[in-house]
């Protein structure tokens, strides 16, 4: 799971943050975990940050490290909770590009987001919730072009 406020351990380097779960579960040796951390950092375009600490990174870089950390345990499903909401607008795209690449590779992603253009672009199914309840569910085409509830119609008129 990836959260909006990164949840990186400040006393660990970028690599150590990524290696922690695979090492604690005896999933990988230290050497294999280091190799995997480097591969994952390359995947999110941050290999040069391997030995840096979270406070040396931008918000977008921290979020990409959080993505790499989540991928370190080889999940079948990636859960993303408002992963761009704490970022400056110029950093949002770098995180969304990583998520888009994962979706294209076939990763199942469940994402809570207000990034409607992004949701429309990469989603197979969109769920619109209002006041804690599901109001509409369907293809991006259906929900964005033919919203049936007043709540979704109102929401889309404000954000699109």
How should these model regions be labeled?
Residues 1-140:
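ABC family nucleotide-binding domain
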Residues 128-131, 137, 141-160:
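C-terminal boundary and immediately downstream tail of ABC-type ATPase nucleotide-binding domains
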């Amino acid at each position: 799971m990836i959260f909006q406020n990164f949840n990186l351990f400040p006393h660990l380097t970028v690599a150590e943050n990524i290696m922690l779960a695979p090492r604690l579960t005896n999933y990988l040796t230290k050497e294999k975990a280091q190799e995997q951390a480097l591969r994952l950092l390359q995947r999110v375009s941050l290999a040069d940050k391997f030995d840096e600490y979270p406070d040396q990174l931008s918000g977008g870089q921290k979020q990409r490290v959080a993505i790499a950390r989540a991928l370190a345990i080889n999940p079948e499903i990636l859960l993303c909770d408002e992963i761009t909401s704490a970022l400056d607008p110029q950093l949002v795209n770098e995180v969304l590009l990583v998520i888009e690449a994962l979706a294209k590779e076939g990763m199942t992603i469940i994402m809570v987001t207000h990034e409607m253009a992004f949701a429309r672009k990469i989603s197979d199914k969109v769920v619109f919730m209002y006041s804690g309840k599901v109001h509409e569910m369907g293809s991006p085409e259906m929900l964005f072009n033919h919203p049936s509830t007043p709540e979704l119609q109102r929401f889309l008129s404000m954000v699109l």
